[in-house]
Design a protein with these regions (language model features):
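Catalytic domains of carbohydrate-active enzymes that cleave complex glycans
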Residues: 273-518
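Short amphipathic alpha-helical segments
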Residues: 38-41, 155, 312, 335
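Hydrophobic transmembrane alpha-helix bundles
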Residues: 41, 45, 93-104, 130-137, ...
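Feature activates predominantly on carbohydrate-active enzymes
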Residues: 1-121, 125, 129-138, 168
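Charged/polar interaction segments and conserved charged motifs
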Residues: 62-63, 73-95, 109-127, 157, ...
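Catalytic-core regions of glycoside hydrolase
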Residues: 29-32, 105-318, 324-328
Length: 518
């Protein structure tokens, strides 16, 4: 989600690699030269992606600047496209839906306005004349303050189809995001709003429109059930959007390997039903690209799974590890692969176990804030809206007796999730408000289980830290700097895991009135 000023929304590895100021255009605004450092960086970026089978790159943030549609930036995009093309990578752009109005060419951005339609057709012609193999547009519309067709009482289909018609003659596509809440269905359970918004439009989109949806129905949480929009949209092609950058899973400070989470998603949504996979990248201009040395494994795993979703998370972890650290000694690879393979579950446990979700700090999203409430913010941004802790229990009732979010799932999941006795415990507090003394499958009460999960999460990070500090270094000859960096970050991760556990249990104890178990 790279911005034109070099910043990256939810980026944790430095600034953007797309340094627009280092691309100089000729006097006529065309042609262009590029700094050697940027050229070399982009070649390396292209080679890395091509080695994984990644075949496209959206160069800018979904919260897009209208400037992206100016001749200056289109000609700069051409310079990047020329570098990526030999590696089989097409460029795409995120657009601001109100671009023609924001740039002063029209008085409206209404997709049914003839002048607006004409502007986009001319703009598409200009882009494809400059970049003949341009891929198309990614659109975030009527979401979190972004403009869209809803501003003119038009539908998402109206907006997407207008853009689709503009790029259709050149083979372009429109990737329209379904991450929409707080607009037409304000007040409805946020996790239901994508289906409520788009189900009635299924089949009304042009054939070059693809609906792009996040893997879960909320927002890239450490664990969510799969998004039911993948079941409810049957005629419109779909892309799954995964978040490689660890916005909610420790950012670039935690060792959290995401392939197990993505494989979990593919266990519910068959990749064969999708026309593509997109990933919110975790790269920046840091020397190691991804901030945390092990975050590189997530970029690698995304590409490998997009190319071959039948691979196991274990296979990918092993591939990455032996290629990166050039050591196949099982005394090194086995424990480190164990760290990687258990790290996502550990993260869930020390942050938001048993189906808890969205209880992180405001704005930067790093660390816990279960008591979070700001009156001026939308309620669906506030942690207290999601855990609903009270003297009776904790959890969000999405059963048929609550918001009926379970009703958006097909059988057998609808009945499975609806019944507290059969709901998988990893989703329990996602779908149910559960009494503190509710008896879990282990025989413990919910409160005891919650304490145990938080403690397990912290204990796992202690295991990672201790092995890495005492045993890993001897196997990393030539990689001492990466060892030191990871060693330091594991200490940071452990302290943050303890903060999550202590803050959340102390807060929830004010409702449960029960002893905190250690």
């Amino acid at each position: 989600w790279d911005n034109l000023d070099g910043s990256i929304e939810r980026g944790y590895a430095g600034k953007s690699i797309f340094k627009w100021e280092e691309i100089k255009l000729g006097k006529n605004g065309k042609g262009g030269s590029i700094s050697k450092s940027l050229h070399d960086r982009l070649i390396t970026y292209a080679r890395a992606n091509a080695s994984l089978g990644i075949n496209g790159s959206v160069l800018n943030n979904v919260n897009a600047s209208p400037k992206m549609m100016t001749a200056e930036y289109i000609n700069k995009v051409k310079v990047i496209a020329n570098i990526l093309r030999p590696y089989g990578i097409r460029v795409y752009l995120s657009i601001n839906f109100a671009s023609p109005m924001a740039l002063g060419y029209t008085k409206t951005a209404d997709p049914l306005d003839k002048k607006v339609q004409q502007w986009w057709k001319k703009k598409a012609k200009e882009i494809y004349a400059t970049i003949p193999d341009f891929g198309g547009f990614l659109v975030k519309a009527n979401s979190e303050g972004q403009p869209g067709p809803g501003d003119y009482h038009r539908t998402h289909a109206d907006g997407a189809n207008m853009l689709a018609d503009a790029v259709k003659p050149y083979g372009g596509i429109i990737m329209w995001r379904s991450f929409v809440y707080g607009a037409n269905h304000k007040g409805e359970d946020r996790v239901k709003q994508a289906v409520s918004e788009f189900k009635g439009m299924d089949g009304k989109f042009r054939d070059n429109v693809i609906l792009q949806s996040k893997n879960g129905p909320l927002d890239f949480q450490p664990r969510e059930p799969y998004a039911p929009i993948f079941d409810n949209i049957k005629q419109t092609p779909q892309i799954a959007e995964l978040q490689i950058t660890q916005e909610y899973l420790g950012q670039s400070k935690h060792l959290t390997y995401l392939a197990p989470m993505w494989k979990e998603f593919f266990g519910f949504v068959n990749p064969d039903r999708l026309v593509g996979i997109s990933g919110v990248a975790n790269i920046g201009d840091d020397a190691n690209w991804c901030g945390h040395p092990f975050s590189q494994a997530n970029w690698y795993a995304f590409g490998r799974l997009a190319w071959n979703p039948s691979l196991t998370a274990e296979e990918i972890a092993h591939e990455w590890l032996v290629q990166t650290y050039e050591n196949q000694d099982e005394k090194f690879t086995k424990p480190v692969e164990m760290m990687m393979m258990t790290s996502r579950e550990a993260c869930v446990n020390y942050m938001m176990p048993l189906g808890l979700h969205h209880i992180f700090k405001f704005d930067h999203h790093y660390g816990p804030e279960p008591d979070g409430f700001i009156a001026s913010y939308p309620l669906e941004w506030c942690p207290i809206y999601y855990h609903k802790a009270d003297a009776q229990g904790v959890g969000f009732d999405r059963s048929s007796k609550g918001t009926d979010a379970v009703g958006q799932y097909p059988e057998p999941y609808r009945s499975l999730y609806d019944n507290i006795a059969t709901c998988p415990e990893e989703y329990l507090l996602w779908f149910h408000h559960v009494a503190w003394d509710y008896k879990m499958k282990s025989g413990s009460t919910l409160w005891q289980e919650l304490c145990m999960k938080y403690n397990m999460g912290v204990a796992m990070v202690e295991v990672y830290r201790d092995f890495w500090h005492t045993s890993a270094k001897q196997y990393m000859k030539g990689h001492e700097q990466e060892w030191q960096h990871t060693d330091s970050l594991l200490n940071v991760q452990l302290e943050n895991a303890k903060e999550w556990r202590n803050t959340c249990l102390k807060y929830f104890q004010t409702f449960s009135k029960m002893k905190v178990y250690e």
